[in-house]
Amino acid sequence: MTKLNELAPAPGSTKGRMRVGRGPGSGKGKTAGRGVKGQKARSGVAIAGFEGGQMPLHMRMPKRGFNNPFRLEFAEVNLWRLEQAVEAGKLKAGADVSVADLVAAGVIRRELDGVKLLGKGEIKSALKLTVYSATEAAIKAVEAAGGSVTVTKKAKVQAEA
C-alpha cells in the first residue's frame, strides 16, 4: 500500500521554478516576461476592482442592508457541550451554573452580550442553568434531565441602558 509520505509526482511531470530577470542568457532576462513598461510591468500588478475606467461591478450593484450598532451577539452553548463538560469534571452535576462558571469551565470563550442555550445533542446531568436566552427544546431537555433553566432575558448591553 502507498504511504502518504512516499507520494511523489510522476517523473518528468513537473518543471523547476524559473528564475526570471537574471541576464539575457537565461531567456527570461531584462523584462522578465512582463513585456515593456506600463502598469502591468510594475510590481503590485493591478489595482483590485479597477476595470480600466469602466464603472466597476462592485459600484454598479446597489447598496444593501446596514450594520446595526445595537445588534446583540450571543455566545451559543449546545446541550452536548454541557454534558461533555460534566463528563470531563469541569462542571458538577446538580450544581448552579452561571455564565461565569461556563467561561471558567472553558465551555465558552467569553460572554459577549449574553449566553444562549441551544438544544443540539443530549444532556443526562441535572444542571441549574442561568442564561440570557434559551430555545424551547433546550429548556425541555434540561428539565427532562432533572435540571432547570432560568432565563434572565436582559443582555449585558440592555441592562446598562
UniProtKB/Swiss-Prot annotation:
Composition-biased stretches (Gly residues): 22-36
Disordered, as annotated region: 1-41
Keywords: Ribonucleoprotein, Ribosomal protein, RNA-binding, rRNA-binding
Record-linked PANTHER family: 50S RIBOSOMAL PROTEIN L15, LARGE RIBOSOMAL SUBUNIT PROTEIN UL15M
Family that this chain belongs to: Belongs to the universal ribosomal protein uL15 family.
NCBIfam families: rplO_bact (TIGR01071)
Primary role: Binds to the 23S rRNA.
UniProt xrefs under HAMAP family: Ribosomal_uL15
Record's protein name: Large ribosomal subunit protein uL15
Organism: Caulobacter sp. (strain K31)
